[in-house]
């Protein structure tokens, strides 16, 4: 057989080449044009914020990694192809005129340069794109330092695991991929160019093909040997099924670890054997080496550890794993900030009795009992404080603390009155109006969380709504700032609500007469012109064209509203702004507003995390931070695994000009220290946090939820007890009937558990249940006070003390409470909603459960039917208190005098200039007086609306007397139904009582 002559490939015409070139340019523009536009816009945006160095550092790092990886991988693949081509046989026999390999060879030879360069280039570019996404790993390797703590197995500083090992793994992976791709390219090249022939019984392999392929296989084996070496270190942070802890256990240390060394030695021996085939010319040797390595990995790497696990460990697991569990306990506490320096454990009875005098003396707690639930009162904020259709409050409000006029620490429900572009209507949605007129919100609203305005005995009475302190631009153009702190600039251009709309940009700046809607007087509308430093100038045609392309909006080019003074505000979400200037941070899901130095700022908590801290428990953020609030708001954390977390950064975003400021909260964090080397001057030292800002820094919710989930296990000191799980705790489920997940932690002002001196403290708290039980096991409090910030106090509760679910069940099924609430909410006339169930340490070793109860007319969530506080229910030990106010409930529970230091309702008056309203068209009947609970004196009963007619000397008509007898008979029937436990009879008795009361009221 002779070599088939090469067929000539058809050539392209000049026109075809031109069309192909034009098409290629258009495709590149479509693919790369938006990327270049976004890059230029980001360059402008980072420069406006003063963080351009962050942007350029990222870009340069990504580009360097891209080119390094692309060149290395592309060069290795190119070398594999080039060697196959350069060492091809001079004469290649064909299998006949229809030999498919000959046809492919002809096609390749006709486009040899295109294929020989294009294929490695494409593979290199793809590898570069993937590689540049690991820029953070590279920067940590370059700038990481020591932790000052060594791992318990190898004695290596933890900085190696945090910063070095991930980089080595990355390099090893790319080397392995590059060599493997070179092997495939070389194999395919030799086959195509005739170095490998499969014709005949045994085929043929050229000497060059044998040397090159064997060399590449040997390199792969050497790389595998290096991988086995690094596998040893990764054992300390991996998890294996059946272990109750993270990290290397008995089997890992005594079987897997030696197996890795044995496999490494076998891989080296096999690599030497493979290389020897170059000289021995026996391909069976590399084949045997590959098979030996595979069998060894199965027998030594998997089989032997399995035997050790089943025969040696399983029968004596607690004792065998004891040493390694101790390692995990120590490491997890270090990694999650749960060491003795941060956590204080105290025994707490949980069921101690308390007198009225003791309760009253517990002023820091009783005067701050929270009755406003930030997850329920948002409709009331909307009803009374919205003002305009385009202003908006989120469904879940926030908690913060301020000092009142007397200097007492109080917690407040706070909200910023933001602009919501999605609520604009009709011509308000016009491009000019949406982006140049309706540009900002106006106002900071705060309500004392321990009181309401007036008493609402039923949801149709005036009262029971929050007391609003609204700091806004008033009708006279002046800033009205009644509290809780002085505010000079209430306008809000940056916030999560305004950023939730698509194309959230606003165009501001001097354009002659003011254009931006600001406020209204009695006669007209007043506009405003933004004077802040924030915003990217768009006065020239280049930037106007760029933003026109970015937002696909021609008005950037043709609108006369935009002039040389115009600026564009965009990327207005506070958390997104922080994540952009600090891409190495994971931010908390909750962003909250505060008045600091007479300005509204958004405070964002930032976390540094690792996922390979030796022996530390591996947690999934989205799982351990989920609670009923997050589920209701569909606001979940990243699905990210961590084994180390620090609240290393506190960030603020100015609500007016968007300025982002990063402060180092944990300056000892090695991860933060590394990033501060990467981005010098981007994070300010902790000493720059002003006292005014420090007073509003909260212990972050997500970190607390992670820590309470870990404390549920890692409060245990004894490894044998840990292994048995007998002393574990559980995060309780939210007992609220409308909840579907874990109970969230609550911010409260109560007595200081960190200092234990009776003073008021702002803290984040959570109850903990016994493992798979509903009894209380512990109470966790994290201090947010400047002096004791970050200190966790854990009150461990022995015995069988009611947990949140048992307490809520006892309260909600109490005869008096269920009777009255059933009457108020009967037939859907009113909707009853239970507020958050708070757990408060009270007296000398007791726990008080407090649940506010709200009601709104009808059974919908319409803003016009906002919920009012109608009752407060409490439980202490097994006793229940109930009343329209905290004072009434305390008196009912503990007796007269218990309410001496409690906060009562404020005087009923029209909120924010509005007249008192009676909502709804239905008038609910007055609730009948429920019978007293057995064993409780009626003296402490709160006054509730009662339809019982007057008694005494008043002379009644015959009809009135008959109606009175019907009421008494109905009450007797109700008592009988209660005693019988027949719910159907009980419902009929309630209806009969209601009819009798109505008849009595209508009778003259």
Swiss-Prot record:
Lineage: Bacteria, Bacillati, Actinomycetota, Actinomycetes, Mycobacteriales
Species of origin: Mycolicibacterium gilvum (strain PYR-GCK) (Mycobacterium gilvum (strain PYR-GCK))
UniProt keyword tRNA-binding, yes or no: no
Membrane topology: Multi-pass membrane protein
Protein name: UPF0182 protein Mflv_4654
Record family assignment: Belongs to the UPF0182 family.
Membrane-traversing stretches: 18-38, 63-83, 114-134, 176-196, 211-231, 260-280, 288-308
Pfam families: UPF0182
Record-level GO cellular component terms: extracellular region; plasma membrane
Keyword Cell wall biogenesis/degradation (UniProt): no
UniProt keyword terms in alphabetical order: Cell membrane, Membrane, Transmembrane, Transmembrane helix
